[in-house]
Amino acid sequence: MNDRKWVTSSVMLVTLSACLALGLSGCSSTKPDAQEQSSSSSPASSDPALTAEIKQSLETTKALSSVHVVVQTTGKVDALLGISNADVDVQANPLAVKGTCTYNDQPGVPFRVLGDNISVKLFDDWSNLGSISDLSTSHVLDPNTGITQVLSGVINLQAQGTEVVDRIPTNKITGTVPTSSVKMLDPKAKGSKLATVWIAQDGSHHLVRASIDLGSGSIQLTQSKWNEPVNTN
Protein backbone atom coordinates (compact mmCIF):
# COMPACT_ATOMS: atom_id res chain seq x y z
CA MET A 1 0.00 0.00 0.00
CA ASN A 2 1.43 3.38 -0.94
CA ASP A 3 1.70 6.20 1.59
CA ARG A 4 -1.36 8.05 0.32
CA LYS A 5 -3.66 5.01 0.60
CA TRP A 6 -2.13 4.11 3.98
CA VAL A 7 -2.81 7.55 5.41
CA THR A 8 -6.30 7.59 3.91
CA SER A 9 -7.24 4.26 5.50
CA SER A 10 -5.74 5.27 8.84
CA VAL A 11 -7.56 8.60 8.98
CA MET A 12 -10.77 6.87 7.95
CA LEU A 13 -10.58 4.42 10.84
CA VAL A 14 -9.76 7.10 13.39
CA THR A 15 -12.66 9.15 12.04
CA LEU A 16 -14.94 6.18 12.54
CA SER A 17 -13.67 5.84 16.09
CA ALA A 18 -14.48 9.48 16.72
CA CYS A 19 -17.95 8.99 15.27
CA LEU A 20 -18.53 6.00 17.50
CA ALA A 21 -17.49 7.93 20.55
CA LEU A 22 -19.81 10.79 19.70
CA GLY A 23 -22.70 8.50 18.94
CA LEU A 24 -23.32 9.48 15.35
CA SER A 25 -25.67 7.00 13.76
CA GLY A 26 -23.92 6.83 10.41
CA CYS A 27 -20.63 5.28 11.42
CA SER A 28 -20.93 1.53 11.09
CA SER A 29 -19.31 -0.81 8.62
CA THR A 30 -21.45 -3.87 9.21
CA LYS A 31 -24.77 -5.08 10.56
CA PRO A 32 -25.27 -7.88 13.08
CA ASP A 33 -26.41 -11.23 11.81
CA ALA A 34 -29.60 -12.82 13.06
CA GLN A 35 -27.88 -14.98 15.67
CA GLU A 36 -26.04 -12.05 17.21
CA GLN A 37 -29.19 -9.91 17.18
CA SER A 38 -31.01 -12.63 19.09
CA SER A 39 -28.17 -12.97 21.59
CA SER A 40 -27.67 -9.26 22.19
CA SER A 41 -31.39 -8.59 22.56
CA SER A 42 -31.66 -11.01 25.47
CA PRO A 43 -28.86 -10.21 27.95
CA ALA A 44 -30.31 -12.53 30.59
CA SER A 45 -27.16 -12.60 32.67
CA SER A 46 -26.89 -8.81 32.94
CA ASP A 47 -28.16 -6.79 35.87
CA PRO A 48 -31.19 -4.79 34.64
CA ALA A 49 -29.83 -1.72 36.43
CA LEU A 50 -26.57 -1.96 34.48
CA THR A 51 -28.47 -2.45 31.23
CA ALA A 52 -30.50 0.66 32.01
CA GLU A 53 -27.35 2.62 32.82
CA ILE A 54 -25.76 1.67 29.51
CA LYS A 55 -28.96 2.57 27.65
CA GLN A 56 -29.19 5.97 29.34
CA SER A 57 -25.55 6.69 28.51
CA LEU A 58 -26.26 5.75 24.89
CA GLU A 59 -29.19 8.14 24.66
CA THR A 60 -27.13 10.92 26.23
CA THR A 61 -24.25 10.31 23.84
CA LYS A 62 -26.53 10.31 20.80
CA ALA A 63 -27.86 13.72 21.83
CA LEU A 64 -24.43 15.40 21.94
CA SER A 65 -23.76 18.28 19.58
CA SER A 66 -19.99 18.16 20.09
CA VAL A 67 -17.30 16.39 22.09
CA HIS A 68 -13.54 16.09 22.44
CA VAL A 69 -12.24 12.57 21.78
CA VAL A 70 -8.89 10.96 22.51
CA VAL A 71 -8.18 7.63 20.79
CA GLN A 72 -5.38 5.49 22.23
CA THR A 73 -4.16 2.03 21.36
CA THR A 74 -2.03 -0.58 23.08
CA GLY A 75 -0.32 -3.56 21.53
CA LYS A 76 -0.86 -4.31 17.86
CA VAL A 77 -4.02 -3.07 16.16
CA ASP A 78 -3.64 -3.92 12.48
CA ALA A 79 -6.89 -2.21 11.50
CA LEU A 80 -5.47 1.23 12.36
CA LEU A 81 -2.65 0.86 9.83
CA GLY A 82 -0.05 2.98 11.58
CA ILE A 83 -2.26 5.18 13.78
CA SER A 84 -1.44 4.70 17.46
CA ASN A 85 -3.42 7.59 18.93
CA ALA A 86 -5.46 10.64 18.00
CA ASP A 87 -6.71 13.80 19.70
CA VAL A 88 -9.70 15.39 17.98
CA ASP A 89 -12.67 17.70 18.31
CA VAL A 90 -15.87 16.31 16.82
CA GLN A 91 -18.99 18.20 15.85
CA ALA A 92 -22.26 16.53 14.94
CA ASN A 93 -24.98 17.54 12.48
CA PRO A 94 -23.18 18.05 10.20
CA LEU A 95 -20.19 15.87 11.02
CA ALA A 96 -16.88 17.72 11.27
CA VAL A 97 -13.66 16.42 12.82
CA LYS A 98 -10.35 18.19 13.35
CA GLY A 99 -7.26 17.24 15.34
CA THR A 100 -3.95 15.44 15.26
CA CYS A 101 -2.76 11.86 15.34
CA THR A 102 0.39 9.83 15.71
CA TYR A 103 0.90 8.19 12.34
CA ASN A 104 3.67 5.66 11.72
CA ASP A 105 5.36 6.82 14.95
CA GLN A 106 5.24 10.45 13.80
CA PRO A 107 3.29 12.56 16.32
CA GLY A 108 1.26 15.66 15.59
CA VAL A 109 0.05 14.81 12.08
CA PRO A 110 -3.01 17.04 11.42
CA PHE A 111 -6.19 15.70 9.86
CA ARG A 112 -9.78 16.80 9.53
CA VAL A 113 -13.17 15.84 8.17
CA LEU A 114 -15.34 18.64 6.80
CA GLY A 115 -18.60 17.72 5.17
CA ASP A 116 -17.91 14.36 3.58
CA ASN A 117 -14.29 15.20 2.75
CA ILE A 118 -11.21 13.84 4.51
CA SER A 119 -8.05 15.96 4.45
CA VAL A 120 -4.61 15.36 5.91
CA LYS A 121 -1.65 17.69 6.32
CA LEU A 122 1.56 15.74 5.90
CA PHE A 123 3.66 18.72 4.84
CA ASP A 124 2.60 22.37 4.54
CA ASP A 125 -0.69 22.04 2.69
CA TRP A 126 -3.95 20.25 3.32
CA SER A 127 -4.59 17.48 0.80
CA ASN A 128 -8.09 16.21 0.09
CA LEU A 129 -8.00 12.41 0.22
CA GLY A 130 -11.61 11.83 -0.80
CA SER A 131 -14.95 11.34 0.90
CA ILE A 132 -16.00 9.17 3.80
CA SER A 133 -18.68 7.46 1.71
CA ASP A 134 -16.24 6.66 -1.10
CA LEU A 135 -13.46 5.36 1.13
CA SER A 136 -15.40 3.46 3.76
CA THR A 137 -16.84 -0.01 3.46
CA SER A 138 -20.45 -0.79 2.62
CA HIS A 139 -23.12 0.59 4.97
CA VAL A 140 -20.67 2.88 6.78
CA LEU A 141 -23.21 5.69 6.56
CA ASP A 142 -26.25 3.53 7.28
CA PRO A 143 -28.38 5.63 9.66
CA ASN A 144 -29.76 2.53 11.35
CA THR A 145 -26.44 1.48 12.83
CA GLY A 146 -23.49 3.01 14.63
CA ILE A 147 -22.90 3.53 18.31
CA THR A 148 -26.36 2.09 18.99
CA GLN A 149 -25.07 -1.29 17.86
CA VAL A 150 -21.89 -1.01 19.91
CA LEU A 151 -23.43 -0.09 23.25
CA SER A 152 -26.83 -1.75 23.07
CA GLY A 153 -25.16 -4.95 21.91
CA VAL A 154 -22.99 -5.31 25.01
CA ILE A 155 -24.05 -8.34 27.06
CA ASN A 156 -22.96 -10.10 30.26
CA LEU A 157 -22.62 -6.75 32.03
CA GLN A 158 -20.85 -6.69 35.38
CA ALA A 159 -20.24 -3.79 37.76
CA GLN A 160 -16.56 -3.25 38.54
CA GLY A 161 -16.89 -0.56 41.19
CA THR A 162 -16.00 3.07 40.74
CA GLU A 163 -12.98 4.80 39.23
CA VAL A 164 -11.88 8.39 38.70
CA VAL A 165 -11.12 9.08 35.02
CA ASP A 166 -9.66 12.47 34.14
CA ARG A 167 -10.83 13.75 37.54
CA ILE A 168 -14.38 12.55 36.86
CA PRO A 169 -15.89 9.93 39.23
CA THR A 170 -17.32 7.11 37.13
CA ASN A 171 -19.05 3.76 37.38
CA LYS A 172 -16.95 1.08 35.72
CA ILE A 173 -18.85 -1.64 33.85
CA THR A 174 -17.50 -4.58 31.84
CA GLY A 175 -19.25 -6.70 29.26
CA THR A 176 -18.96 -8.63 26.02
CA VAL A 177 -19.24 -7.00 22.59
CA PRO A 178 -20.55 -9.19 19.73
CA THR A 179 -18.44 -9.73 16.63
CA SER A 180 -20.52 -7.46 14.41
CA SER A 181 -19.92 -4.53 16.74
CA VAL A 182 -16.21 -5.25 17.11
CA LYS A 183 -15.87 -5.13 13.33
CA MET A 184 -16.58 -1.40 13.40
CA LEU A 185 -13.11 -0.97 14.86
CA ASP A 186 -11.47 -4.13 13.53
CA PRO A 187 -13.00 -5.30 10.23
CA LYS A 188 -11.11 -8.61 10.50
CA ALA A 189 -12.54 -9.52 13.92
CA LYS A 190 -13.81 -13.09 14.15
CA GLY A 191 -15.20 -13.28 17.65
CA SER A 192 -16.77 -11.36 20.50
CA LYS A 193 -14.45 -9.26 22.67
CA LEU A 194 -14.34 -7.87 26.17
CA ALA A 195 -15.25 -4.23 26.65
CA THR A 196 -15.17 -1.78 29.54
CA VAL A 197 -17.10 1.46 29.86
CA TRP A 198 -16.82 4.25 32.40
CA ILE A 199 -19.98 6.32 32.91
CA ALA A 200 -20.06 9.59 34.85
CA GLN A 201 -21.66 9.38 38.30
CA ASP A 202 -22.84 13.00 38.41
CA GLY A 203 -26.21 12.32 36.82
CA SER A 204 -25.15 13.50 33.38
CA HIS A 205 -24.83 9.88 32.15
CA HIS A 206 -21.87 10.92 30.00
CA LEU A 207 -19.80 8.10 28.53
CA VAL A 208 -16.38 9.15 29.80
CA ARG A 209 -14.37 6.24 28.42
CA ALA A 210 -14.83 3.02 26.46
CA SER A 211 -12.22 0.34 25.81
CA ILE A 212 -12.37 -2.79 23.66
CA ASP A 213 -9.81 -5.58 23.89
CA LEU A 214 -9.17 -6.85 20.36
CA GLY A 215 -6.84 -9.66 21.42
CA SER A 216 -3.55 -8.51 19.92
CA GLY A 217 -4.18 -4.99 21.17
CA SER A 218 -6.86 -2.66 22.45
CA ILE A 219 -8.58 0.57 21.43
CA GLN A 220 -9.60 3.11 24.06
CA LEU A 221 -11.73 6.20 23.48
CA THR A 222 -11.98 8.93 26.10
CA GLN A 223 -14.54 11.74 25.86
CA SER A 224 -14.56 15.18 27.45
CA LYS A 225 -15.86 18.72 26.85
CA TRP A 226 -19.37 17.46 26.10
CA ASN A 227 -21.41 20.00 24.11
CA GLU A 228 -18.71 22.65 24.47
CA PRO A 229 -17.91 24.84 21.45
CA VAL A 230 -15.30 23.27 19.16
CA ASN A 231 -13.32 24.65 16.24
CA THR A 232 -13.40 22.21 13.35
CA ASN A 233 -12.75 24.70 10.53
Curated annotation (Swiss-Prot):
Residues 35-49 have a biased composition (Low complexity). PROSITE patterns: PROKAR_LIPOPROTEIN (PS51257). SUPFAM superfamilies: Prokaryotic lipoproteins and lipoprotein localization factors. It is a lipid-anchor. Keywords: Cell membrane, Cell wall, Lipid transport, Lipoprotein, Membrane, Palmitate, Secreted, Signal, Transport. Residues 31-50 are annotated as: Disordered. One of its GO terms (biological process) is lipid transport. Forms a U-shaped beta-half-barrel with a large hydrophobic cavity which is large enough to hold a single phthiocerol dimycocerosate (PDIM) molecule. Belongs to the LppX/LprAFG lipoprotein family. This is Putative phthiocerol dimycocerosate transporter LppX.
